[in-house]
């Protein structure tokens, strides 16, 4: 009888392995798709370049601006690391992250007068969107376009709903990215790290411990 139980266990194990081989691709692809939010473009009061990924997000934001998507583009002041701050002070690096973002927007055709720079330094997406929401309330903006990467979009949407209190609409616009959700992203280290980072970020958001994961 023991050999029969062993045989059954082996058959079950082989079956599970075969099932995993057959289903891992659609499951992983679905895991990537869950993170993506991409909404049809509509005219809003401002286009927000969610910090990171310069100049890709700036290029997409500038394209929306040129198409009449909004009369202005908003750029946050991303906190720089001590190492980057030293490079700035030494003159080795001429611009901080916000300065690079502004210059990229200008290169892509956005007039400086149409670029709104926020002064408050922000370290994570939550504090960034909180600052954006505060700026929107102060200026009377009711609708914004939030530009980010595909895998970052779901978390941005959830954070925005929390920080805006539902009073200011935030529409997601995702950029073309080399980590496309439909591609086998799990075969590329950077893309795999991005997906893992987003799921950890969603968990931290749910547990309200994002400030501990800087």
Model-derived regions: residue spans:
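A structural signal for short, hydrophobic/glycine-enriched beta-strand patches
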Residues: 26-187
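A transmembrane-helix-recognition feature enriched in membrane-embedded lipid enzymes
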Residues: 188-214
């Amino acid at each position: 009888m023991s050999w029969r139980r062993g045989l059954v266990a082996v058959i079950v194990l082989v079956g599970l392995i075969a099932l995993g081989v057959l289903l891992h691709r659609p499951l992983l692809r679905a895991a990537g798709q869950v993170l993506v939010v991409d909404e049809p473009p509509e005219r809003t009061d401002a286009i927000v370049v969610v910090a990171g990924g310069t100049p890709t997000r700036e290029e997409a934001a500038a394209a929306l601006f040129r198409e009449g998507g909004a009369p202005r583009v908003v750029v946050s002041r991303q906190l720089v690391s001590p190492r980057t701050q030293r490079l700035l002070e030494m003159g080795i690096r001429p611009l901080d992250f916000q300065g690079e973002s502004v210059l990229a927007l200008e290169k892509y055709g956005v007039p400086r007068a149409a670029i709104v720079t926020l002064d408050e330094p922000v370290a994570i997406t939550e504090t960034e969107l909180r600052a954006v929401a505060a700026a929107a309330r102060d200026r009377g903006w009711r609708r914004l376009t939030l530009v980010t990467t595909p895998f970052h979009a779901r978390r941005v949407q959830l954070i925005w709903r929390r920080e805006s209190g539902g009073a200011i609409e935030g529409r997601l616009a995702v950029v073309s990215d080399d980590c496309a959700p439909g591609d086998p992203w799990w075969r590329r280290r950077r893309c795999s790290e991005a997906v893992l980072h987003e799921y950890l970020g969603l968990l931290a958001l749910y547990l309200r411990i994002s400030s501990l994961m800087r």
